[in-house]
């Protein structure tokens, strides 16, 4: 089905009466489906529809900005959230410990990995490091060569290793989605952690956000300008300087 609304209706109608125990998908789009299912059933939480639901395997976008919204529609204490890292180019990682947000790198799936330091991505001849050469807590752009024919292909994501035995990592952003206009090196991971803290302080639920640098002129210092779309908030903190 090419029409999104028709697809949502079909999925909702076919799954509401079924014993669903697990979900898999992109957090933003799955949330749209969940809300439609709750609308159609008149239920307040998803476990009222699917009492045996216990896990959501998610990927595609960061889950952090959506976590609070999921808590609003799924109250079950047995619900688990497992991050996966897959793309059309391959399957690269999965969270193997619910107490650790890092993902285990899939090293036996016919993929040869190389890693380019984020600060070298735009250079003409960046240095690519093999897996055993990576450093912990450093941002790298991931480069892959696969048995399917991809050769030193930069997939556009940035990762940071948290362990080398075994190799575990977190996704920190995209090679093109960062701001470094003034040497600040703001990446998606930093931004989303900051937004999550702001949400916790204000009770806000965020839908989307965007940020851009504003350069210094005779009237103001260099800075960032943020546009944040919020579903709701319970209170706002007083402006602090």
Regions found by a protein language model. Name each.
Residues 1-237:
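Active-site glycine/GP-rich loop and adjacent strand/helix microenvironment
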């Amino acid at each position: 089905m090419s029409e999104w609304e028709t697809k949502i209706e079909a999925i909702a109608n076919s799954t509401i009466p079924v014993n669903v125990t697990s979900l898999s998908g992109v957090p933003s789009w799955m949330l749209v489906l969940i809300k439609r299912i709750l609308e159609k059933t008149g239920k307040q939480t998803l476990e009222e529809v699917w009492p045996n639901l216990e896990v959501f395997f998610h990927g595609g976008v960061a889950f952090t900005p959506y976590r609070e919204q999921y808590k609003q529609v799924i109250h079950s204490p047995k619900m688990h959230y497992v991050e996966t890292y897959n793309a059309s180019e391959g399957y690269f990682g999965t969270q193997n410990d619910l107490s650790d947000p890092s993902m285990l790198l899939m090293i036996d799936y016919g993929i040869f990995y190389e890693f380019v330091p984020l600060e070298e991505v735009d250079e003409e001849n960046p240095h690519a490091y093999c897996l055993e050469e990576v450093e912990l807590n450093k941002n790298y752009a991931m480069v892959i060569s696969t048995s399917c024919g991809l050769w030193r292909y930069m997939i556009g994501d940035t990762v940071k290793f948290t362990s080398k035995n075994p190799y575990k990592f977190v996704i920190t952003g995209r090679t093109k989605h960062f701001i470094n206009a003034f040497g600040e090196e703001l990446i998606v991971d930093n931004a989303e952690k900051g937004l999550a803290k702001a949400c916790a302080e204000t009770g806000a639920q965020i839908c989307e956000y965007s940020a851009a640098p504003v350069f210094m002129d005779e009237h103001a210092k260099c800075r960032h300008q943020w546009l944040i779309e919020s579903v709701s908030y319970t209170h706002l903190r007083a402006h602090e300087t």
